[in-house]
């Protein structure tokens, strides 16, 4: 008796040695969360097998494609470990695949067989040839071993055989959560959501902090940050978004004589607030969307000056990316349609006419002393709003719509 399943194949986890089991456990937890209901997960050498009878096969496959740590996601039929069952399954899969494309020319195919169970009665080549001959006889398809349009993938295990005609890319990287927890400084632009995604891909679970210009700006940037965090929730387990109003603090910095140092002084303020939030929430690092030299505030001198305002590590996954690379990645992961929406953000509030490209931390400390920076940080933290964005569900979420957030305690 055959049944639909998905082969979830990982890459980097396979070289983790004695720690591989721990990484696998983390991956299994994330797979269960991604499916969002009862799912049977079986472990095989080098991959996992996921089955969920209550799920549409295409939906199950799509959800597993969003799980970090998987290199390949392969929908398949699981059949008893006999030559006849596997051959019949291959013919059936190809027949159904062609029926879904009425009017299309008959494609070429090739069978790739692999035996993990070496006591199987046929060699891999002989098994592939046997299945191929049956396909040619029953369906009339042509064989192309060099560049087949449809590869038939057959994997022989001791207890079952997996037959597949599709091999889809996964997200790669490491399972979210296996590298620790971080707090992402999330703006409404292209850069920081992509930085969050890249951090997740290296195993970091990410919460988010967003700074608004309230009470001098409208809540549009908060709604936008909420939508971005919700979209990014497709790739990890539940996270929180902390919204911090810094309009009054920015006004204080502007009147403390910051002038062309104002933007870097703000960045130091944001890092101080984010660091204190991270410490209170037991997060291990901060993540920003900085790209070296992209704008005046992101010169090496200014990044060094900003980092000296905090002691937690500040991770910058996009430090060597150019803007077009970032936008291309944003489109791929689903955040670009939100980032392009207009909003009233804190960066546009009281913006100076010029921004220094080289700054001295000593000069910035003088400005912070005048503004009483510690008091500004405490006042901002007293007005934090905590949101739970959840995650997008469904095949094609309406990404260009910004939902109003849900506020929770804590």
From Swiss-Prot:
Its EC number is 2.8.1.4. Residues 58-167 form the THUMP domain. ATP binds at residues 185-186, 210-211, 267, 289, 298. Its main location: cytoplasm. GO terms for cellular component: cytosol. Pfam families: ThiI, ThiI_fer, THUMP. One of its GO terms (molecular function) is tRNA binding. It catalyses: [ThiI sulfur-carrier protein]-S-sulfanyl-L-cysteine + a uridine in tRNA + 2 reduced [2Fe-2S]-[ferredoxin] + ATP + H(+) = [ThiI sulfur-carrier protein]-L-cysteine + a 4-thiouridine in tRNA + 2 oxidized [2Fe-2S]-[ferredoxin] + AMP + diphosphate; [ThiS sulfur-carrier protein]-C-terminal Gly-Gly-AMP + S-sulfanyl-L-cysteinyl-[cysteine desulfurase] + AH2 = [ThiS sulfur-carrier protein]-C-terminal-Gly-aminoethanethioate + L-cysteinyl-[cysteine desulfurase] + A + AMP + 2 H(+). It comes from the Bacteria. GO terms for biological process: thiamine biosynthetic process; thiamine diphosphate biosynthetic process; thiazole biosynthetic process; tRNA 4-thiouridine biosynthesis. Pathway: Cofactor biosynthesis; thiamine diphosphate biosynthesis. It is found in: Cytoplasm. Keywords: ATP-binding, Cytoplasm, Nucleotide-binding, RNA-binding, Thiamine biosynthesis, Transferase, tRNA-binding. CDD domains: PPase_ThiI, THUMP_ThiI. PANTHER family: TRNA SULFURTRANSFERASE. Belongs to the ThiI family. Catalyzes the ATP-dependent transfer of a sulfur to tRNA to produce 4-thiouridine in position 8 of tRNAs, which functions as a near-UV photosensor. Also catalyzes the transfer of sulfur to the sulfur carrier protein ThiS, forming ThiS-thiocarboxylate. This is a step in the synthesis of thiazole, in the thiamine biosynthesis pathway. The sulfur is donated as persulfide by IscS. This is Probable tRNA sulfurtransferase. It comes from Nocardia farcinica (strain IFM 10152). The gene is thiI.
